[in-house]
Amino acid sequence: MDRRTFLGNLMATAATLPGSHLTFSAEQAEIPSYLRGYETLYGQDSHAAALEWFKNAKFGLMMHYGLYSQLGRGEWVMLHEKIPVATYEKMKETFNPHQFDADAIADLALDAGMKYVTCTSKHHEGFCLFRTKQTPYNSVDSPAQRDLMGELAAACRKKGLGLFLYYSYSADWHHPYFYSRSAGWDFARPAYDQPQPEYLWRQDADFRLYIDYVHNQLRELLTQYGPLAGIWFDPVMGFYARPDLFPLAETYALIYSLQPQCLISFKQGANGSEDFAAPERQRPGAAPNPFRSILPSRRETANEVLSRAWHINQKKQIELCNTLQPNGWGYSKADDGKHRHAEEVIQMINSAWAAGDNLLLNTGPLADGSISAEDVKTLREVGRHIRGGSASSISVRREKGESS
């Protein structure tokens, strides 16, 4: 059964089930604001409309924001510095995003010539920036009492931007039942000198408790914030290390059942059924990945999974993700004054668009949720270049069907 038949049967069934979770509200029945202009195709196949929109969107803003932003040493600081779970958790009490302005962020994206925003709803640290009943480890239940994803969804909807929610599917350093380092991947947990009492995973069967948690959170994300452009999964390395533990088909089907137009990405690819590929900085090379963080006994399988998925996904739309900081994705104080300038970003855009790819450009908000002044300046200048034709000429040629 193909996707269109599956979704058609699903919606027909949903219409006959009183109280079904698959029943759409009047707001959801209308075309999402970011898909305006695609009404005809949307009426025929909402997913096809979303794919066509994404191919034409070309340029998006990514944000990595979380508790780690308070430390200013990147989004992997918990793992790299082996910060104990209990110690790291205390940053929930000092989380204060008082300068996180969703409307200003959306306006900045528009000023830069972007068509969509991708933001971390949960990074590897496990802290959630959305309303969830699955854990108190979230921004709404913090002293800040802010549902940042809800605020961002409202701003994007109002301004016609697509919203992708980044979700750390195959890493969670806080959840008690994510698998251990010894189960296959060095980055599954920080390499603590002492066992952490919060970690309860003992055998593969325990991992289902984590998957149930993930699926419940995906239901929340897909039912609380209106139509989403997509779910952006990461980090694929955690999947490559243990593909047997992740029920991808079940996870993907859940997403499509709740929002048929919603796109799914999982970096360069997990099983090849993703809607587009989103490799970091550049497309994967032909040489096998050394997978140094994966147990040697699992590297051959990891490469087979990667090769199979990329063989399929490289024929789809590609989204190259890169950073305005020279190094990591979350805010790094050491990079202050060293961020990329507009000229370099224009080169990235031209290179991506010449290949027919999208560019997803990341900024790491500061601890208070504000965007780096360096990045604001660069993004506005990039937008002026695009509106002036410096970067958009390639786009125009592509739309006319000319070769680039």
Where are these regions (language model features)?
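N-terminal twin-arginine translocation
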Residues: 1-5, 14-29
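Mature catalytic domains of secreted/periplasmic carbohydrate-active enzymes
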Residues: 8-12, 26-404
